[in-house]
Amino acid sequence: MIRELDWKELKYFAKPQKPTKVKKGKKGETDDKPLELIGQERAAEALEFGLQIKAQGYHIYVCGATGTGRTTFAREYAKAKAATEAVPPDLCYVYNFKNPKCPKLLRLPAGMGKRLKEDMNELIVRLSEELPRTFADKTYEQKKNEIIKVLKTKQDEIIKEMSVEARKHDFEVKNSNSGIFFVPIIEGETITEEQFESLSSEQKEIITKKSESIQQRASEALREIKDYEKTTKKEVDELDFALGLFTVGHHMNDIIETFADEPELLEYLKAVKEDILDNLVDFVSEEAEEEESIQAFMPWYNKKSNEDNLTKYKINLLTDNSELTGAPVVVDYNPSYPNLVGEVEYDNEFGNLSTDFMKIKPGLLHKANGGYLILQAQDILGSPHAWETLRRTLITEKIITEPLREYTTGVAVSGVKPEPIPVDIKIIIIGGGYYYDVLYTYDDYFEKLFKIRVDFDYEMKMNDQNIAELAKFIARNTSEANPFAPCAVASIIEYATRIAERKDRLTTRFNRLAEILTEAVVWANMDKSDKVLSKHVKKAIEKRDYRLNMYEEKLSEMLEEDSIMVSTEGEKIGQINGLAVLDTGDHVFAKPSRITATAYMGKAGIVNIEKEADMSGSIHDKGVQVMIGYLGQTYAKDFPLSLSSRICFEQNYNGIDGDSASSTELYAVLSALAEIPIRQDIAITGSMNQHGEIQPIGGATYKVEGFFDLCKTRGLTGNQGVIIPTRNIRDLVLKDEVIEAVKQKKFHIYPIAHIDEGFPILMNLPAGEFPYPADTVHGKVFRKLRSYHRKVMKE
């Protein structure tokens, strides 16, 4: 008995209902659960579990289709968990007085880094103001001059003694910027260099010997002067230190007292205090004007101001967590190498590159340290060296900030080398299954680092709870100025089943639904309607399809013009209408295709012309082999098959794969064998196994609509229709015009569960049971194959 689907079986008919208003709370939340998490119970459980584990290697990969709210899902759950956790410490880099090229890391309680930075900046300002005043005091100048006066007196005494000694040896002492030297005296007067050269050799020799004697005494005198200078400098330094200690100690002690509970910080502050006292000149130097005058005529001169010297006392606050109330949650879409681990910036002044610890800039790993970093798989795999850098960080548990050139080549680049930062972070990567498979297959560390996989479902069950949640979603994403009527809500629910491609499922790709909500509001406004009605939702869907279906329309034109030959009336032997689904990325549709078969006596078996031309995939080739198995199982238990048959997808130039046409091809082969014509106003789709059972296929809705559109274009006769697998009935979510045509008996949809059920529809003959009567399809095929075998045996 031929079964035909009733129009009520062709989609889910939603009941009109009002969008459910939600209580205003945190963004994205309803009365009971965040809207983006509807239907994601498995994912929620997996993510909650992953967030609880703090052990190394338990990072998270959220896997699912785009548009299902994966990022929002991960962010909201991470925020909820982060809110219960401690605020991580501030990260600061400070000057390393023992090794200036390697800035020192300070980890301080949240908020303390900001205060330290402010206190140190204030210290620099105050000392820059007070120390010059202190050292400009008259009392200080008097004490300093007294010390210097003693030195001057000693210098004068030593030089005077040297002058007397030199006179005894006929020399006069001369003092210059380059030091002390002696000029010979002849006949009571000093001589010039030219006069010395004009002297005889004997005179020169006498003067030279005298000079050697006096030079020895001069060396002793110079040593005495230097000793006095050292003593004087020490006394001046002690004076400066004592004076500076009062001013510096006053301010530094306040800072030290503030941070008395931080031993590591106290050690740094002690080093700061010692360095300031050793370099008081940096606060009171008067060399700035001189350097500015030099730079006026030598622009390339690298002026180093007092401010540059004082930079070493500043604090480079990498992360300021003073405003946080829990652990940080960072979401980013540009995880480049420098954005991940930070970078060291350089100043370029006339080709002279310079840097210091204050030019170390934080990256995402710094900002998210102690919390959660959410990245997109596509972004991190598409950015050079980003994945390798993230992997290294997770393996070593350290953030290493170094120039990219140094990381990639191993060649050291001159500059600062910051102390690595211990990392305590949970990485959440958002991506599709493809990227997960790539990482799992080609990176040995991936499964060791990302042990939690969160599978995000693209659909949810059709039940009252999920329908209610979907109604809340509609309310959440629409305004009171453009309310959705109950009929419009029903249309959105029906559209959700169409995206899911099942009557008993609702899509979780809420971005697709949100787009239709937005566009439906626009159509309602253009219609000057105070409410969004069902017709506005349907128009939004229709117009969206229209914007995307140009390629589909071009193929439809070719079918209408018979450039692509597909018959929709009459009967033909060895010719049948198949259906293929095409996906252009943002639009899916089906194209009817003519499949032909020839059959004749021989031993070649069934030859797939597409395979011979290297235009078929392995799954399609498997379908052909399944068909051969069916023929042998059904007809050749008592004799071998003596058959040659060729099957072909006509006008196929792009290749083909999949087994959804295996039953279609079988009908064409059997038609050619038994010479039974096939109705051309029927198209068929369905996979099969070797026992003739019809298996479900994908895209059933689009395939039915594809053949319907062709028949509608050529004119509906009332006899046209499509055969689909029985197991695909639940997948049908057809357009209203198809449903209306079925309702009016202008178009027909026949479900079948076995090959035998299709014969009465396609060939107007029963299948027949063994021993296969002559007036059945099996009987005609069986007799033809047996006659082939007998003829072959006679040969």
Label each residue range with its predicted role.
Residues 356-365, 371-384, 388-390, 396, ...:
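Peripheral, non-AAA+ core regions of ATP-driven protein-machinery
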